[in-house]
Amino acid sequence: MPQLNPHPWFFIMLASWLTFSLIIQPKLLTFVTMNPPSNKPPIAPSTTPWTWPWT
């Protein structure tokens, strides 16, 4: 059964993952901007309760 022969398929999988990991991924990571860490403490939002007209 040819689909059980790993010779051509393993090389294709390995080549595609190496292409992705070494070429495409570093190019994509340059476009992703991370938020810089801030020293401000997290502030909880102040909310007011809603009064429902039927209660």
From Swiss-Prot:
Location within or outside the cell: Mitochondrion membrane
Disulfides per UniProt: none
Pfam families linked: ATP-synt_8 (PF00895)
Coiled-coil region(s): none
GO CC terms of this entry: mitochondrial membrane; proton-transporting ATP synthase complex
UniProt-recorded Gene Ontology molecular function terms: proton transmembrane transporter activity
Signal peptide start-end: none
Role: Subunit 8, of the mitochondrial membrane ATP synthase complex (F(1)F(0) ATP synthase or Complex V) that produces ATP from ADP in the presence of a proton gradient across the membrane which is generated by electron transport complexes of the respiratory chain. ATP synthase complex consist of a soluble F(1) head domain - the catalytic core - and a membrane F(1) domain - the membrane proton channel. These two domains are linked by a central stalk rotating inside the F(1) region and a stationary peripheral stalk.
Subunit details: Component of the ATP synthase complex composed at least of ATP5F1A/subunit alpha, ATP5F1B/subunit beta, ATP5MC1/subunit c (homooctomer), MT-ATP6/subunit a, MT-ATP8/subunit 8, ATP5ME/subunit e, ATP5MF/subunit f, ATP5MG/subunit g, ATP5MK/subunit k, ATP5MJ/subunit j, ATP5F1C/subunit gamma, ATP5F1D/subunit delta, ATP5F1E/subunit epsilon, ATP5PF/subunit F6, ATP5PB/subunit b, ATP5PD/subunit d, ATP5PO/subunit OSCP.
Annotated protein name in UniProt: ATP synthase F(0) complex subunit 8
